[in-house]
Each structure stands twice: as C-alpha cells, then as structure tokens.
Amino acid sequence: MKKLLFLFFLTISIKLSFAQFFGQIPTPVKYNEAKVVDPVYGIAMYEKLNFFTGGDSVRNDKKGYACQGWMEDTYENGNILHKGFYEDGHLKTYKNFYSNGNVERSFKLVEFKVCNLQLFFPDGKLKSNITYYDGSPQIWTDYYPNGQIEYTEENSKNMEYVIMRKSYAEDGKPQEIFEITDLKKKLYSKKEYYENGNIKAEGPMKYSKLVSDYQKDGLWKEYDESGKVTEHKWVNGEEVTD
C-alpha cells in the first residue's frame, strides 16, 4: 500500500513540480543539474511526455511542430541529460543520465500494451524495475543501494487484485509477505515480522469486491517477541470474540 501511495504522490509531484517545463517543450536546451535532478524522484520531468505511463504533454521543435525522431538535451557542462525517440511529440523510448554519465532511468516498449521502466542510483546500481501494462504498474520491484530487494509487488493485468506484495529490511530480513493462495477464490496468506526477522503475525485473508479491499478471514496467530502465540478468529474483516 505504501508503494501505491508513493506512486500516486510521485505522479502528482511530476505534474506540479515540473509543470513549468512542459505543455510544449522548445528546442533542446542546457539544464542546470540542481534544477532537474530531484533527490527523491530523480529526473522526472520527461514523464509528462510519456503517454505509456500517463503523460499528457507534447514536445515541440523550434518551429512549433511536434518533435519527430531522436532528441537530446544536455547539462550546462555539456554532458547528456536526455536522449529520446519522439513520435508526434510523444516519447517512445528514452534514457536520462546523471551528470556523471551514468543512466538515471531507461524506458522502452516491450510489446503491445507492455513497457518497462528502470531507475538507477547515481552509482549505476538498479533502484527500481517497473513493468507497465496498459498504463498501470503491473510488476514493481524497488532495491536498496546495497542491492537487496526493498519491496516487490505484482498485480493482475486489469489491476483488479494483487498477486503478491513483499517488503524487506536492508539486511534482507522479511518485513511483510502477502501472496495469493487461491486465484479463483481470491484467498491470500499474510505474514508480518519483527525487525529481527522473527514471525510477528500470520493468517489468511480474502479479497472483498464489496469493499474493494483485503480482509482478515480465518484463524490468525500472533506471536510476542519471545515466540509465545495467541490465536484470534476473524470473519469478513471483523474479529470474532466468544
């Protein structure tokens, strides 16, 4: 859920923070690094030109026509900032670069309705790998700077339900594991962990179309830090008490 919220606020941030760059972007210019590389979101200003991931702007050339073919933008020091292929002003494939020359992100169309976006740390290590289906992030994995997986999620193609969602600490210990156990009935298992990696709680869940959310449903076990277990029964998201 936190990653879905992050994606939502990232989209909003792109639309607000970089609105001044877009609508109709002029001929290539040289950019100041501090103004285009956000410490959290990276070089996000070109996302407005990517219709495959929800962009709604067009890039024009110096004559006012929609850009066609390869375009490059640079930093003030002359290093490449952006290289992208445009069709009718829309990005089809592109790479952004840090001022040190390392790739900041790379986007490409894989097949009809399927595209891939990879983001990188300044040292070149993979930061995020996102596969979009029909404009929505279907498969998403984030990494820590040390290469460990921080978060990974897979959704159905129609984005109607989650297939799996897992988060990990920087040392690789699990924090939360949520995965489907019965695709037809939309039944799930969920496990939560303490910081030391010991199990904290586990039990079954189900997807409810009525509330469009996941509910505890069945016998849940909760563990204290010594490992002592207590059991609780849940039905349709409500705990049943005797």
Pin down the residues of each PLM region:
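Bacterial Sec-dependent N-terminal signal peptides
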Residues: 1-26
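Glycine/tyrosine- and acidic-biased, solvent-exposed loop/turn segments at the edges of beta-strands
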Residues: 19-242
